[in-house]
Amino acid sequence: MKLSILPLIALATAVVASPAPDANSMKLMNQAKDFGMSVAQGGLKDIAKTLDDEDIPGDSPISLCDAEYEQLLEIKHLSIDPNPPAKGQNLTIEASGYLYEDVEEGAYIEVEVRYGYIRLISQTLDLCEQSEQVDWSCPIKAGDLKLNKQIELPNEIPPGKYVAVARAYTVDDDLITCLLTTVTFPASL
C-alpha cells in the first residue's frame, strides 16, 4: 500500500539536519558561526505559535505543536536513528500515523528554521512536490500511513542549535499537522 503525508516528518527533520539548501542560508549560517549568537528581530519564541506542544511516541526530538487545534494527521509513532542526528551519518526515520481526510493538490507546508536567533529559512512549500522526495504522490488518501526513509546528512553542518517548525495545510487551509524540533550539532574535534 503506497502511503504518504509523513514526508512532512522527513522534511522537518531533513530541513533541520541539513538547513542550507541555498547560498543565502549558507551565508547566514556562516555569519552566525563566525560571530556567535546574534539577537535578531523576533526570537525563538515566535517560531511556534503556542506552548502547547505534545511529545510524539517514539524516539525523536520532534514534537507536535499547535496541539490545541484539530489536526488531520494523528502521528502514532516517530523514531529517528541516530537520535540525536549526527553530521556525516545517515538518518533513518520511521513513522506511522492516521490521516483523517484525503489531501489534494494545492496542500502546502510553511517551514521556518532558525540557527540560534537567526532565521535561516521561512518559506512555503508545495506538500505534493515534497511528497515526491519520498516516492509518494498526491492525492494522499485517508487511512493508515507508514514511513521508513533514510536521509544522508552532510559533514558540513555548522555546529549550533537549530529549531524548525513545519505546519502542513490542506488546499482549504485546514491544519494537517504541526511539527516542532530542536537539534544541536556539536563542534567537531
From Swiss-Prot:
- Give the GO molecular function terms: sterol binding
Task: Write out the propeptide range(s).
Answer: 18-52
Q: Which residues form the signal peptide?
A: 1-17
Q: Which CDD domains match?
A: PG-PI_TP (cd00917)
* Gene Ontology terms: biological process: intracellular sterol transport; sterol transport
Record keywords: Lipid transport, Signal, Transport
Matches recorded under SUPFAM superfamilies: E set domains (SSF81296)
**Transport listed as a keyword:** yes
**Top-level division of the source organism's lineage:** Eukaryota
Family that this chain belongs to? Belongs to the NPC2 family.
Describe the function of this protein.
Catalyzes the intermembrane transfer of phosphatidylglycerol and phosphatidylinositol.
The subunit field of the Swiss-Prot or TrEMBL record says: Monomer.
Name of the protein in question: Phosphatidylglycerol/phosphatidylinositol transfer protein
Q: Which species does the entry assign this protein to?
A: Yarrowia lipolytica (strain CLIB 122 / E 150) (Yeast)
Q: What is the lineage of its organism?
A: Eukaryota, Fungi, Dikarya, Ascomycota, Saccharomycotina
